[in-house]
Structure formats: C-alpha cells, structure tokens
Amino acid sequence: QKIEVLEYEELANLLDYKALEEFRKNALNPSHPVTRGTAQNPDVYFQLCESLNKYYDDIPSIVEEYMGKITELTGREYHCFDYYGAEDADRIIISMGAINEVIEETIDYLRNKGEKVGLIKVRLYRPFSIERLLNCIPSTVKKIAVLDRTKEPGSIGEPLYLDILRAVNEIENPPKVIGGRFGLGSKDPYPSDIAAVYENLASETPKNRFTIGIIDDITNNSLEPIKEVDVTTEGTTACKFRFRWNSWSK
C-alpha cells in the first residue's frame, strides 16, 4: 500500500508544548529531587489507584479532539469507533486491525446482493468508551459478531468480545452478541470467511466462540467458508507467476 507521510512541521502543530513541558517536569532531575520507590503504604494505596480514574476518563475526548485535527490535515475522518456499511444493518461485525479492510470488501459484496450488514472498527481500545461505542451501533442491529485476534484459554471469551458483551447490556433491548477468533499464526481470513460470519449471524442459533480461517476437526468450532465470494472490482487484472527451479548435476 502507498502511504503519504505527514511533514514534521504539520505534526509539530498537533503537539501541546505546554502539556509536554509539564509532563517532562515529572522526570527525575537533580535540580528538583524527589524520592520515588516501588513500595507504597497500604493506608493510601487503594485511594491513589482510584484517583487515576479522571485521567483515563478524559482520554477518549482528547483522542477524538486530535483525530479531528488529523482529519483537517489529511481529509480522512477517524473516531474512537467508526462505522461502515448499511445504515439499517441488522447484523454487524466489531473488530480492530487490518482485518477491517477485508470485512469492508465483503460488506460491499454482500450489500450488492441486498444484505443489510455492517462493521464497527475499533480505533481506541483502551480506555474503552462505552458511550461512543453505543452511539456507533445502528438502532436496527439485532446481532453482533465480535472478532478477536487472540485466544484466552480457560476464559469464557476473548477480551474484545467480553468488553462488547458488557457494553451492549446498557441498551434497553440489547442485540445478541457472539464471539469468534481469527488470524493466529498468520492464518489471515479471506472474504469467504467473513461472509461465513455474516451467514452464521443470520441463523436462528448462531455458533458462539467460533473460528475462521482454519478447519477445526477436533472441537468443530470453525465456520465453513462461503464458496464463490469474489470481491474483485471491475477492470482488475490478476496474474499468477510460477517459478520453477531445477538443479542439474554435472
């Protein structure tokens, strides 16, 4: 992929130098020495841990502010959560990372066939903003599949799945939420795998804690890819090159 790099002067305009100066003042410095250690008395430890809440609560708003400034520079719009797909979607996927590009291509393909599907892209994972997530979910959504690129053995679910499950419980009539895993060991999913996720959501009893991109013939948790899902745009030329090497003995 081709990228356009922002100039250092443009990035410098995004930096709050006053806040940076205040942050650097907290560094250890012989000019204004302080004592710091790894131990803290139990009478105040818990209270000090909770006193950090405000700083974390403020982060999503700060991130949104600077994402707005990036939009002014680049023309690309970013938020803590971004939605892609049908405005009246009844099934959506929530995920983060490079898989979102594959999901977007699959959404375009399925929408051309009349399906009401969508995607929420997680851009700020921690701290997690429940309010911003809920504002991003279309009111028409009935089912959600959360995709995690990790496996938590022994847990009832993977991290993002559990966060989404907790968040949607604040909705009066929450949609059904299921979770799945993908991409471990570079087993990257194809559009046919993503289409299988949406098909699984469409069923009356969708499989939970599923996997895509592999064939699980041991615990049978994998979803079978949908055949003949072609997301190639019109006018695309695809070429396959094969290299053959022979070693000739003398």
What function would you assign to each model-found segment?
Residues I93, K121, I144, I164, ...:
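Buried hydrophobic positions in well-ordered alpha/beta secondary-structure cores of metabolic enzymes
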